[in-house]
């Protein structure tokens, strides 16, 4: 079970680093001083993210023996599996950002790649805050960075709808299916 958790966690972050690195390098989104980051732009962060994803693939290509951690062996994914991890997680991050992008009010000058840079920066801020789901932090960064493209009240409605679609709806469906499963299991 621990191996699966580590594999999934690694996949989650590899996708974030790969798509975040790519978008950050291509978009050159400025970082507001309010966020107190050591960089004025996301470009250096993008380079670091791409280096991490590349280093992972390189390590998986060079290492043949399982890693030993705390007396347990972790198998090394093959190169196709490593690329699959990155691809699947990157697509997941892209879809997540695209859901919010589609919900946003029409804005001139806001391209999908530019929005993805903003979205991923907001997601990173939310994750680094250690607040469950980045609740409030994610929305604040989105509002701050998209305020030049749209009215904050319209953005807030889109953010609320995004939370509903991407978090609450899957939870409700899963809860319903679990309840049905439990009821049928008792019969």
Label every PLM stretch briefly.
Residues 11-16, 21-127, 152, 157, ...:
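Predominantly cytoplasmic-facing regulatory/coupling regions of multi-pass membrane proteins
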Residues 1-9:
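Juxtamembrane loop-to-helix connectors within ABC transporter transmembrane domains
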Residues 132-147:
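Re-entrant/interfacial helical elements at transmembrane boundaries that shape
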Residues 3, 72-75, 143:
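Short amphipathic alpha-helical coupling elements at transmembrane boundaries
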Residues 1, 156-159:
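Membrane-interface helix-entry/capping residues at the boundaries of transmembrane alpha-helices
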Residues 147-149, 161:
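Alpha-helix C-terminal capping segments
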């Amino acid at each position: 079970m621990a191996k699966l958790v580590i594999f999934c966690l690694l996949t989650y972050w590899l996708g974030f680093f790969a798509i975040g690195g790519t978008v950050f390098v291509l978009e050159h989104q400025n970082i507001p001083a309010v966020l107190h980051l050591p960089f004025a732009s996301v470009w250096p962060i993008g380079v670091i993210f791409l280096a991490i994803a590349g280093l992972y693939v390189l390590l998986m290509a060079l290492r043949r023996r399982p890693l030993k951690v705390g007396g347990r062996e972790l198998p090394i994914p093959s190169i196709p599996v490593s690329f699959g991890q990155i691809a699947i997680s990157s697509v997941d991050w892209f879809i997540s950002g695209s859901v919010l992008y589609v919900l946003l009010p029409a804005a001139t000058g806001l391209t999908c790649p530019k929005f993805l840079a903003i979205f991923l920066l907001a997601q990173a801020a939310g994750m680094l805050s250690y607040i469950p789901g980045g609740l409030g932090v994610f929305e604040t960064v989105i509002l701050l960075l998209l305020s030049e493209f749209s009215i904050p009240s319209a953005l807030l409605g889109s953010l609320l709808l995004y939370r509903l679609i991407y978090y609450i709806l899957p939870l409700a469906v899963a809860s319903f299916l679990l309840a049905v499963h439990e009821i049928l299991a008792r019969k």
